């Protein structure tokens, strides 16, 4: 005789809708965490955003100059 398959019960993980503290550490001291990240990485952010803002402003100025040039 062959083996009979055994039915296994599935394990279901769920969060109770009445549970209020799901991730309490995520929102704790949020301004302090943001300040720490910004003060830690300000040089990288400047080096990233500086050329982007410069290029964008140059393109906007160039387009405005082109518009005025073809006005008359």
Curated annotation (Swiss-Prot):
Topology with respect to the bilayer: Single-pass membrane protein
Annotated compartments: Mitochondrion inner membrane
UniProt cross-references to Pfam families, sorted A to Z: Cyt_b-c1_8
Topological domain spans for side Mitochondrial matrix: 2-41
Matches recorded under SUPFAM superfamilies: Ubiquinone-binding protein QP-C of cytochrome bc1 complex (Ubiquinol-cytochrome c reductase) (SSF81508)
GO terms classed as biological process: mitochondrial electron transport, ubiquinol to cytochrome c
GO cellular component, one term: respiratory chain complex III
Mitochondrial intermembrane side: 60-72
Function, as annotated: Component of the ubiquinol-cytochrome c oxidoreductase, a multisubunit transmembrane complex that is part of the mitochondrial electron transport chain which drives oxidative phosphorylation.
Family statement: Belongs to the UQCRQ/QCR8 family.
Name of the protein: Cytochrome b-c1 complex subunit 8
Organism, scientific name: Solanum tuberosum (Potato)
């Amino acid at each position: 005789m062959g083996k009979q398959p055994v039915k296994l019960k599935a394990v279901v993980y769920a969060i109770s809708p009445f549970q209020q503290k799901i991730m309490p550490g995520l929102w704790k001291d949020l301004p302090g965490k943001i300040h720490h990240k910004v003060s830690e990485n300000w040089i990288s952010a400047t080096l990233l955003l500086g050329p982007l803002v410069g290029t964008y402003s140059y393109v906007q100025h160039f387009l405005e100059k082109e518009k005025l040039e073809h006005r008359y």
